[in-house]
């Protein structure tokens, strides 16, 4: 069987790695850019290792990447962010983030009665008896809840932090999604971790697994321009060649899939997903020649909805000796009247971020060796809110497979890319077995 995978990000690499284990499957992975990894692409500059976004993994002991580690034989190390060094700032007051019982007892975000209420909510989530799963959205649940406003604000902020979205969007996250996500996170013994060495450690090993099979081609800088069906095979056309395949996997944002299938018999089936919106944030990375300050590992500004991670406090492999790597992230609102309004908003976010750096890391400007600012970085191709629809891995009357962080799968962000890709690979292999039995 010959398989085409379109897209060389985390999902495409994962699907190809699983399929490459089967000696009867060969294929081509098409990637239009010069490098693999997609938004997990990693590069070095002046001794600093930079990602296009964070490489934190939430609840790693219950995460899909741990399953992949076992099934694909991956080798990597991770380090947990020190929970005692994770802080929230509200109205210029610093307090521990309520990541566990110890921090919850220490935090000043809630009074003693509110803490008891919040512990009760966490316990109910863990036991799968919290009724948030019966509400269409977090906003609907909070509207009927008799909890104090501080408890409601904390729920909103937790969802903002884990889903990388603004409070108004956090209220649109479906209740069942929140219930399942926090059930896993609250049960985890390792809530926030970094893959030491960044995503490159994972993507390099996935590529190596694919290469070692000898049956797969990694076609970099080769975009697929059209997909057709003829003589019981799929015909994929690129700028320089035309190839035939038995199965096709789309491992790319749904917005790009719609463009590629425009004018094809399958275009109408993609219409329900055309209006999906992406999760986008501002990313502000600074690599410092020396450690200017290390008051904590993470500071979240609850008032302005942005945070700074001292990435090098957890992962020392990303910096030259004596250096410091700080990453600022700002959650972004959508829906501006015009481009001028959007630009003014982004400029104000940049100023807020720099003010946060000034406040907690004085002297950073003079010690900056590397700076990278992305005012609109995609974190997930589909924001998991009620007004969007995640793309299923299979659609009725459409002969393709779909995977990625915008598809139905376990978890959020990278975990959904991994889980949907693993599901697709297993479905193709199962489909192949059934075809053999049928013949």
Language-model region placement:
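Mid-domain catalytic core of redox enzymes
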Residues: 223-326
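Conserved flavin/dinucleotide-binding core of flavoenzymes
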Residues: 311, 317-439
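Mobile amphipathic helical/loop "lid" adjacent to a hydrophobic cofactor/ligand pocket
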Residues: 69, 73-172
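N-terminal Rossmann-like FAD-binding beta1-loop-alpha1 element of flavoenzymes
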Residues: 2-29
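Glycine-rich FAD pyrophosphate-binding loop
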Residues: 20-44
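Conserved FAD-binding subdomain of flavin-dependent enzymes
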Residues: 35, 42, 47-80, 127-130
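Helical element adjacent to the flavin cofactor pocket in flavoenzyme catalytic cores
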Residues: 180-238
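Conserved Rossmann-like nucleotide-cofactor binding loop
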Residues: 11, 35, 255
């Amino acid at each position: 069987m010959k398989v085409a995978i379109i897209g060389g990000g985390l999902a495409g690499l994962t699907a190809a790695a699983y399929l490459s284990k089967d000696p009867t499957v060969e294929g081509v992975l098409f990637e239009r850019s010069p490098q693999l990894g997609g938004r997990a692409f990693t590069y070095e500059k002046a001794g600093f290792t930079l990602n296009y976004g964070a490489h934190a993994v939430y609840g790693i002991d219950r995460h899909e990447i741990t399953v992949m580690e076992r099934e694909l034989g991956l080798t990597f190390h991770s380090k947990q962010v020190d929970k005692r060094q994770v802080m929230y700032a509200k109205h210029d007051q610093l307090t521990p983030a309520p990541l566990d019982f110890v921090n919850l007892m220490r935090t000043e975000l809630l009074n003693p009665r509110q803490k008891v209420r919040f512990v009760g909510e966490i316990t109910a989530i863990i036991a799968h008896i919290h009724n948030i799963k019966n509400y269409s959205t977090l906003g609907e649940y909070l509207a009927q809840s008799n909890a104090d406003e501080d408890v409601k604000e904390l729920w909103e902020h937790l969802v903002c932090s884990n889903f990388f979205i603004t409070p108004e969007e956090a209220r649109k996250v479906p209740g069942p999604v929140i219930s399942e996500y926090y059930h896993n996170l609250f049960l985890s013994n390792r809530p926030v971790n970094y893959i030491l060495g960044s995503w490159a450690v994972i993507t390099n090993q996935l590529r190596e697994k694919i290469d070692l099979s000898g049956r797969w081609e990694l076609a970099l800088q080769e975009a697929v321009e059209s997909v057709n069906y003829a003589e019981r095979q799929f015909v994929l056309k690129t700028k320089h060649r035309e190839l035939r395949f038995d199965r096709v996997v789309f491992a790319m944002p749904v917005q790009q899939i719609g463009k590629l299938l425009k004018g094809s018999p399958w275009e109408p089936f993609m219409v329900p997903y055309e209006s999906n919106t992406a999760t986008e944030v501002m990313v502000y990375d600074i690599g410092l020649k020396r450690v200017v300050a290390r008051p904590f590992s993470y500071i979240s500004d609850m008032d302005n909805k942005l945070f700074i991670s001292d990435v090098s406090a957890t992962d020392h492999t990303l910096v030259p000796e004596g250096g410091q790597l700080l990453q600022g992230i700002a959650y972004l609102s959508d829906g501006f009247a015009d481009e001028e309004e959007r630009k003014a908003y982004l400029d104000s976010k940049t100023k807020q971020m720099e003010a946060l750096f000034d406040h907690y890391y004085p002297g950073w400007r003079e010690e900056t060796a590397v700076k990278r600012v992305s005012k609109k970085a995609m974190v997930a191709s589909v924001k998991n809110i009620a007004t969007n629809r995640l793309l299923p891995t299979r659609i009725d009357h459409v002969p393709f497979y779909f995977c990625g962080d915008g598809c139905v799968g376990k978890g959020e962000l990278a975990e959904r890319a991994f889980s949907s890709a693993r599901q697709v690979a297993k479905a193709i292999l199962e489909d192949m077995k059934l075809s053999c039995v049928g013949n």
